[in-house]
Design a protein with these regions (language model features):
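Retroelement reverse transcriptase polymerase core
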Residues: 1-153
């Protein structure tokens, strides 16, 4: 974070009645998975909403624009796919990783969790896991994946 930042407390996006149950259920699902945790009011509050996907599931989105303005990003060099393919050429084995919700495998420290607070008309939640939408999330995730897979090269 940049020095001397001021917290941001935004207004909750309105949720149409037709989508309220679906949105609440997705919030509950993410709480059960340990991604979100219900919290009392805080200095930070970022509006969130869901979008409906073609497969009838929903995707949870948070507006981290105000947080991203206050972040100092530490870029991680993401390797080109052509480099990775050259490295595995001639390998005996290959595999695929299912990284659905991959960012959510990385725990946030308590200070980051306090900033990653989201608000709905019915309450506030804090992210306990790395959310999609934070400017540094791809760098953090790629760094963690590189560390975890380092010995497989």
């Amino acid at each position: 974070m940049k020095e001397k930042i001021s917290p941001y407390f935004g207004q909750a996006f309105p949720v149409p009645k037709i989508h309220k149950d679906t949105t609440m259920k997705e919030g509950e699902r993410l709480c059960k998975l340990g991604v979100l945790e219900r919290q009392p009011a805080s200095e930070w509050a970022l509006p969130s909403f869901i979008i409906h996907k073609k497969d009838k599931t929903v995707h949870f989105l948070s507006d981290f624009w105000e947080v991203n303005k206050r972040l100092v990003r530490t870029p991680f060099p993401i390797r080109k796919i052509s480099t990775v393919l050259q490295e595995i050429e001639g390998s005996s084995y290959a595999t695929a990783l299912d990284l659905n919700m991959g960012y959510h495998t990385i725990r946030l420290d308590p200070d980051a969790s306090k900033i990653c607070m989201v608000i709905f008309p019915w309450g506030e939640y804090s992210y306990k896991r790395l959310p999609v939408g934070i400017a540094g999330s791809p760098d953090i995730f790629q760094g963690e994946m590189s560390e975890q897979l380092r010995e497989l090269n």
